[in-house]
Amino acid sequence: MSHSQCTQISDNYPPSLGISDDTSVSLCPSDGLQPFTPDLTYTHQFNFTQPAPLLPPPETLERVGPRNKKIYVLWTEMVNDDFVTWWLSTEYGSQMKRNIFEGKHQSECWQHFHQVAAIQDGSPKVMYKVCNHILSHPADRHRGTSSMNKHYSSGVNCRKSVPVSKDIKRLIQDGMHSAPQKTHYTAKAWMERLVTFITTSRLPFQLVEYPQFRALIEMAQRAPLLPILPCAKTIRNHLQELVQERQKSLLQKLSQGAKLSIALDCWTSPFRQSFMAVTGYFLDVDWNYREILLGFEPLSGSHTGAYLSTVLQQVLEEHQIEARILTVTTDNAANNSTLMNSLSESLQSIELPNQIPVIHIPCMAHIIQLSLNELLGRMEVNPRNDREEIEWTERDKSAQPENQDIIHTLEKIRRLAVFINRSPQRRENFLYLQSKEPKLVPIQDVRTRWNSTFLMLYRARKLQSTFDEYCSEYGQPDLKLTKEEWRQVDYLLSITKPFFTFTTSLSQTKEVTIHSVFAIYNYLFTHLEKSKEKLSEYYAMTDHVGGDLYAIGTILAPQNKLEFFSTSEWEPEWRVRYRKSLEEYIVPYEKRYSETQTQSIPIRQILTGGISDIDMLVTAATSLQPRTTAHDEISRYLGSSTQLMNPRIFWKDHQFKYPILASLAQYILTTPASGSGVERLFNSARDICHYRRGSLKPHTIKELMLFMCTTKFDLESEELSLMDEYLTTQEIQRAREERDAQQALEAQNTKYDFDPISDSEEAESEDESLVLPQSPQASQARSQRSLGKRPAREEEPLIELDGNEEDEVPLPYNRHLVTVSSTQRRSSGRQPKRSKRDEDFVYETP
């Protein structure tokens, strides 16, 4: 056989690599030679060693090679995982045992080469992108990149050596085959894409029902061409621009020269990043109550008052509102006092025109919770844990106190909650005992969560029958509550109910609240006397707020006016003092009103119907201008009857009748009584700081929060339902139960899930009284510090039991609160304003 014949035979048969290459065969022209037929009579036998089976490359990897001989596999970053998995199973890869393809290549020549590996044995190579020339990989035996640089430098000659195929038809077919195929739209393909997107991105299924997602799809459909998706960096840059635009747009709704109030608080993310949130509150020209997140500033170092003041001042300067701050609402942390002092000094040093001292407002919701904690602490029933416990041992079961007091009752409920929630099997058994939906599990109170003790008891009382049945059926008699202990639960619910009601209401409201502070204090004093010392301490501080701001806010509420201070609980001098404070506080507003009236007013704005043009010509414009004084407005306003009406709506409707008072109300009513708006903001921040987003930088978190809260804090209802996908069933139910409890407690004639404690039941036994023992020194100290602002009343007479009360369950026994000196006579929980009487004399009641 001639040499040419051998060559043709070798070209017409596939190479001996164990693969089929149809492309190489089809491009070789046939000259009509007969196929080679081996001699079947040749019987010489050979013994070959069976090679190890070679794992074929996955279909996701692209085959490449010079002159269309695709005997190499191409590596790219997109297919790195599949490539490395296959390559490590090859002869070369199994020996090297490391990924040599994914690395930092500093040399410039790497930009012109592909990294490949031979299909036969996995030997690493590099392939020049221009001519597909194959060179040894620099990482193989540490050859370096000299050969790559040499080949690249002679790139002109290399490109000339590339053969030009004459088979144009074949090239077109290859191009069509290698081009990415677009999937035709079908309902099934669309559904598959959605499912893949949601599951691989770990998003909730309700995403498809989210209005913003639907709006995004609709906008893409309206595009004349397929929209181009921007990169992540472009979106982040655009986010910052949108935040600035929206904040500027919202602050433009603040009237010229108007004041706004702010609230602030600090928060630590799950990733231990600290932030300070600064929220602003104001009434716009249409009397809409506006909330705006002014800053969500990352913090570093020690959170001293001076440092926080510097951060706050930077936020105010950024928005150019340093001279427009009326009040600052904070919690009762010690560093906030330093913050306010430092802020006041800084603002005074600037010497701003018409600067009014900034007033510090303590958060009312924090005060209520401090008072409740003080009460529960005196009863020794406060939780000591910061988080819900998840561990349970038999030692916990045997560590219960022996006395049958109220402390023991709470410990039973707490331990039962830990016992059930600790084991999935015990949770399942507890849920199985419940026949109605929703099926619930016990919850445990924690020291750091507001109202957690009330919610724990409320849940336990709701599941009383299930508690009893579980303890009986699953052998936990020591954790089963008796009838008397369930009555103690009712007692604690009765005590903590008002605290829960007011705290929740303050946290949820988005209306003006400054006018309700005095009323909340009075109600809690009336309800409870065990915590009145803590309440009195803060109640007395309201006298030191500049200009009697609380009293003015109370008077500006149409349902209060001065009648609020006309009851027997207030001494007459307080009514006189607060009216005088109102008259003094309104002076600058009267001056500003007079200045605005001197300016030219379009006559058409003050015309009334039926006035002819002749009458307008002969009537002086100044005679048509309304004339009023602050004293006149105060007299007319206070002289009218009270109205049960939202203060904001009232002053919107009467802003032309009382223009000076309305301008004052528009400033005073912006003051938030609590910082609950910031607390709601932190709930949204937890959703942003998700554990899958742990790499977010503090600056990015700040921009995300500012963008989300430029118009409002709370998510819309459809957004809330979307976030429910991230929560467990029990977390969702706990939030719903809190809302349901609030609605039930606010209803006037609602039958509660627990029975209120009556006065007769409280006074049943002298030995079981819950009156805290007080020494003479303690009583005297409290009379001077915490009696508050209203004159002390006589002690109420003892309520005796009648014949029908004998079967009532006695008050919970607490051995820590009983002393020999305890009596059943209790002083009123009310702490009226004290009259100005000489403290050196003892006054006897006639």
Swiss-Prot record:
InterPro entries: HATC_C_dom, RNaseH-like_sf, ZnF_BED_domain_contain. A zinc finger (BED-type) spans 104-166. It comes from the Eukaryota. It holds the Pfam family Dimer_Tnp_hAT. Keywords: Metal-binding, Nucleus, Zinc, Zinc-finger. GO terms for cellular component: nucleus. Residues 734-846 are annotated as: Disordered. Putative transcriptional regulator; part of the gene cluster that mediates the biosynthesis of polyesters containing 2,4-dihydroxy-6-(2-hydroxypropyl)benzoate and 3-hydroxybutyrate moieties, such as talapolyester G, 15G256beta and 15G256beta-2; as well as to oxidized derivatives such as 15G256alpha. This is Putative transcriptional regulator tpeD. It comes from Talaromyces stipitatus (strain ATCC 10500 / CBS 375.48 / QM 6759 / NRRL 1006).
